């Protein structure tokens, strides 16, 4: 992407608007939203990166390891489950988000928070396609995180193997 500076600049602006640390949605939750969206899209590269970023920013390692079981894990609140459900549905092709899901979102999240949640899902729609199409090799830290926390649940680096 560095070959297209305007593209990089636009992406950085979009990323910083979504990943603001002082947003209304917990930064760690946004990373887990991006993670389950990436899993739905099948992008092992982004799954490893979002798990590593979540770990790096202080998300409990047990929660990262349990994220694929968020619907039943006691580590997740109902509000988090509702947001993660929308992430799975919103990342599906075709999109599977429903009016009922958004009604549930509104029970726990205000409009600004919902925009942050959907922004994270949409941003990773782009990043999943970019990284899965170009198939970059995984860097050491995300690869190690993937192997430690995600591989026990079936994750592999796939075409992103170093």
Predicted regions and their residues:
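Hydrophobic alpha-helical segments
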Residues: 1-162
């Amino acid at each position: 992407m560095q070959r297209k500076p305007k593209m990089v600049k636009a992406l950085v602006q979009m990323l910083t608007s979504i990943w603001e640390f002082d947003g209304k949605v917990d930064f760690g939750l946004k990373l887990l939203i991006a993670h389950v969206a990436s899993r739905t899209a099948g992008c092992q590269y982004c799954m490893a990166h979002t798990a590593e970023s979540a770990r790096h920013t202080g998300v409990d390692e047990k929660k990262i390891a349990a994220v694929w079981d968020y619907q039943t894990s006691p580590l997740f609140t109902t509000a988090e489950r509702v947001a993660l459900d929308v992430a799975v549905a919103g990342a599906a092709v075709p999109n599977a988000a429903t009016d009922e899901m958004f009604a549930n979102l509104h029970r726990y999240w205000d409009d600004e928070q919902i925009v942050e949640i959907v922004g994270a899902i949409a941003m990773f729609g782009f990043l999943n396609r970019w990284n899965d199409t170009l198939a970059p090799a995984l860097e050491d830290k995300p690869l190690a995180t993937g192997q430690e926390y995600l591989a026990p649940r079936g994750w592999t680096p796939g075409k992103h193997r170093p």
